[in-house]
Amino acid sequence: MIADDVPEPLAAGENIRTALDEWIAAKGYVRPGLSLESLAREVGCNRSYLSRYVNSELGLNFKLWIRALRIAESQRLLLEHPGASALEVGEMVGIHGRSTFFAQFSEVTGMSPGEYRRRYAGGDPIAPSQE
């Protein structure tokens, strides 16, 4: 996604949960350089409010929440695009660098992207970390 593709900010009065659900559905979390400040602007609230909301409602800090969204998307992509390398999948979800992607993927799932692909490519359900 390039900078010109950034969606217009949502109306300030819109419910933050609805705004975040729409942002997640649009896969806004895959954009490189995503920050708490940029997301707050997109959903029409201030940085502090968004941070408190994510911490209290989702039980994660902002960086861990974005990481979880990106890894969940990478799990889907690994299975849907068997010809894509792990590096390509990492870049598709906004995680740049092979070692960074492998480290984050392994931390969240407990296995490497290749192990995940081998284990679940046969149509088994998504890994337990996503249930």
Locate predicted features:
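Short, Lys/Arg-enriched, Trp-marked, Pro/Gly-tolerant hinge/linker segments that flank
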Residues: 1-18, 29, 56, 60-61
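Central "turn" residue of the DNA-binding helix-turn-helix
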Residues: 41-44, 94-96
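…primarily DNA-binding HTH/wHTH and HhH modules…
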Residues: 3, 7, 103-131
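Sequence-specific DNA-binding recognition helix
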Residues: 81-117
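Terminal helix-turn-helix DNA-binding modules in bacterial transcription factors
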Residues: 56-93, 119-131
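Basic, amphipathic alpha-helical hairpins
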Residues: 20-34, 54, 58, 75-84, ...
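HTH DNA-binding helix-turn interface
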Residues: 51-65, 105-113
